[in-house]
From Swiss-Prot:
The gene is D2HGDH. Changing A231V: In D2HGA1; uncertain significance; significant loss of catalytic activity. Belongs to the FAD-binding oxidoreductase/transferase type 4 family. Catalyzes the oxidation of D-2-hydroxyglutarate (D-2-HG) to alpha-ketoglutarate. Also catalyzes the oxidation of other D-2-hydroxyacids, such as D-malate (D-MAL) and D-lactate (D-LAC). Exhibits high activities towards D-2-HG and D-MAL but a very weak activity towards D-LAC. It comes from the Eukaryota. This is D-2-hydroxyglutarate dehydrogenase, mitochondrial. Its cofactor is FAD. It is an enzyme of class 1 (oxidoreductase).
């Protein structure tokens, strides 16, 4: 039942630790390992070129003269050691592997400019890489592209305490930026499960959505300016810190979501909202998906402006989080669970509104059980149940991941459809995501990669999504995995214009090749 007094956190919620911090703290699994370096005994990831039908384009190969030139541009920032290159060649899901022989670690936009000028002259392909936490293979090479890492471009350049405008380099880690602005009574407008590793430049390049999208919208609205280095080394300065600028084309929008195919983002200007004085989280069990939808409608009506997140997950998600991460549900077992967050300026006012909503939801049968938290520690505990689902899935076997945007009322139908379609051939079929913006994370696990299972999933998932007028990528981007399925979400004319923009800004095609755009539009 919903607590009517201050929450006394049950001891069994912390089972499986030693100690609460070990179980509920910052993830210690793959997300915490940048580049997802192989653990001892882990099977080697097959080369992408051997698993997928892709041919290398006629780029040059890196020579000793190229390495010498790079060493002059970034002294001490040229990595050629094969062991050190293993992790950045492999994607986070451990399903794609390139064979790059060199990684460059510039510190400044000027160094990036010199690198790209040299690569443009020599026709050398470049793979930009941030925290390497992407889900669609956009951040790792397909063949032997040079990896350009932004990891050393990690300085905050300015922060204005009145406007909340942050200017920083692209390699700043999202969690560290969050800590920086929170110390100044602001928050970042996005929050991701991968925040401990992902870079703000990668977030912008992929137009990452995340857990605060419902309240603060997309990066197309919160990013005020960008500095971008084009394929030929030209530095494009669109780094305004103005909230209003109606002079000509808004060029920065081209690069938000372009996944490093049009230019490399080196500096970001972003608007940070004020830090809420009161944050409350409720975790509820629902008897069915229809009740999840009704709870969301009721929630919007009763909570209004203080509603900042509405997440849902199915029972299988909770079972996997418990099995692989030893995190227990704080409510009784239910077919579905929802996590609701409110953020506001008046703790008493917000708690009262949330309490009235919870009483109504329970009394009307929308919710069968629930609990809520107001202090930061317990809030983080409840959020961990949602944020660490991806980690739990990665421990369940090979994962087929789909990031779909669908009409809210049809959001879960594809999950039940696939369970019937796949039967025992899939280990688990789960659905969770951001109900507030119609984003479903559909995941299918199996003991190992299976071509027959993949054939049963694709193109069926994309055809089903197109039939609902949905999108095959809600927030993860396109990368390598989805480049040839854009036609399910974009008309031929739009694809042709994208190809024309790519040819204009990167005529040699050296920036992140084999990604984002179809091989043939």
């Amino acid at each position: 039942m919903l607590p009517r007094r201050p929450l006394a956190w049950p001891a069994w919620l912390l089972r499986g630790a030693p100690g609460a911090a070990g179980s509920w703290g910052r993830p210690v699994g793959p997300l915490a390992r940048r580049g997802c370096c192989s653990a001892p005994g882990t099977p080697e990831v097959p080369l992408t070129r051997e698993r997928y039908p892709v041919r290398r384009l006629p780029f040059s190969t890196v020579s000793k003269q190229d390495l010498a030139a790079f060493e002059r541009i970034v002294p001490g920032g040229v990595v050629t050691d094969p062991e050190a290159l293993q992790a950045p060649n492999v994607d986070w899901l451990r399903t794609l592997r390139g064979c790059s022989k060199v990684l460059l670690r510039p510190r400044t936009s000027e160094e990036v400019s010199h690198i790209l000028r040299h690569c443009h002259e020599r026709n050398l392909a470049v793979n930009p890489q941030g925290g390497n936490t992407g889900m669609v293979g956009g951040s790792v090479p397909v063949f032997d592209e040079i990896i350009l890492s932004t990891a050393r471009m990690n300085r905050v350049l300015s922060f204005h305490s009145v406007s909340g405008i942050l200017v920083c380099q692209a390699g700043c880690v999202l969690e560290e930026l969050s800590r920086y602005v929170e110390e100044r009574d602001f928050i970042m407008p996005l929050d991701l499960g991968a925040k401990g590793s992902c870079h703000i430049g990668g977030n912008v390049a992929t137009n990452a959505g995340g857990l605060r999208f419902l309240r603060y919208g997309s990066l197309h609205g919160t990013v005020l300016g960008l500095e971008v280095v084009l394929a030929d080394g030209t530095v494009l300065d669109c780094l305004t810190s103005l909230r209003k600028d109606n002079t000509g084309y808004d060029l920065k929008q081209l690069f938000i979501g372009s996944e490093g195919t049009l230019g490399i983002i080196t500096t970001v200007s972003i608007l940070c909202p004020p830090k809420p004085r009161a944050v409350n989280v409720a975790f509820l069990g629902c008897p069915g998906f229809a009740e999840v939808l009704q709870t969301f409608s009721t929630c919007k009506g009763m909570l209004g402006e203080i509603l900042s997140a509405f997440e849902f997950m199915d029972a299988v998600c909770m079972q996997l989080v418990g099995r692989h991460l030893h995190l227990a549900s704080p409510v009784q077992e239910s077919p579905f669970y929802v996590l609701i967050e409110t953020s506001g300026s008046n703790a008493g006012h917000d708690a009262e509104k949330l309490g009235h909503f919870l009483e109504h939801a329970l009394g009307s049968g929308l919710v069968t059980d629930g609990t809520m938290a107001t202090d930061q520690r317990k809030v983080k505990m409840l959020w961990a149940l949602r944020e660490r689902i991806t980690e739990a899935l990665s421990r369940d076997g090979y994962v087929y991941k789909y990031d779909l945007s669908l009409p809210v009322e049809r959001l879960y139908d594809i999950v039940t459809d696939l369970r019937a379609r796949l039967g025992p051939h899939a280990k688990h079929v789960v659905g969770y995501g951001h109900l507030g913006d119609g984003n479903l994370h559909l995941n299918v696990t199996a003991e190992a990669f299976s071509p027959s299972l993949l054939a049963a999933l694709e193109p069926h998932v994309y055809e089903w999504t197109a039939g609902q007028q949905g999108s095959v990528s809600a927030e993860h981007g396109v990368g390598f995995r989805k480049r040839d399925v854009l036609g399910y979400s974009k008309p031929p004319g739009a694809l042709q214009l994208m190809q024309q923009l790519k040819a204009l800004l990167d005529p040699k095609g050296i920036l992140n090749p084999y990604k984002t755009l179809p091989s043939q539009a």
